[in-house]
Amino acid sequence: MFSEWGLGSVSEELTQEAARGYILSCVNQAVEEALEEGSTFVQVERSEGGEPMAVHTDTAALNRLRAQVLSKLEKTLNGSVTVKVPAGSLTGIALLNGHGFPVPLTLRLEASADLSFHTEFVSAGINQSCHRVTMLVAVQAYSQSKRFETQTHVETSTVLAETVLVGDVPEMALLETG
């Protein structure tokens, strides 16, 4: 059979990219499912006049999100998984790489995931600041399949909340020139 003939020419790089694509798909699906609840991660506290005074992050909601994503990833990333590589990549002919019908490869993945949150304030203009909460998912995976041994590291980030805080714009600015 053609696929068995070409399996010996599957490079470690091709196996690594196939595993990487599978992992990214799993991470994106886990994050999307966890975010479907529509939780609010940030609350802006305002003064009686309506001006922003403080920004509060809902740590309980972030911890629930973390637990949901990591739980889903633990279920989907470990064990026997099937990835697909283009048949042309099995021929050893550079011109055909990346083309052709998909040929399934079975990988025995062992993976671990870590999830962290980052919060930052960045300038968004004159007397404006942008508060952003970002989630970073990092996955380290290893395929112990005898024929398709590979190791890969994947990181992806998702912006969970972004709030622009607007203050009063000064009517006049003094510039010091040298």
Regions found by a protein language model. Name each.
Residues D58-T59, N63-E176:
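Soluble extracytoplasmic domains of inner/organellar membrane proteins
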Residues E4, S39-F41, T156:
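Generic secondary-structure boundary/loop-capping signal
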Residues M1-A18:
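Transmembrane signal-anchor/signal-peptide helices with a preference for the extracytoplasmic
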Residues V42-A67:
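Signal peptide-directed extracytoplasmic domains
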Residues E4-W5, S9, S47, E51, ...:
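A generic structural signal for ordered alpha-helices
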Residues Q16-E51:
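Short extracytoplasmic
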Residues W5-G6, L24-S25, Q29, R147:
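Hydrophobic alpha-helical segments involved in membrane association or supramolecular assembly
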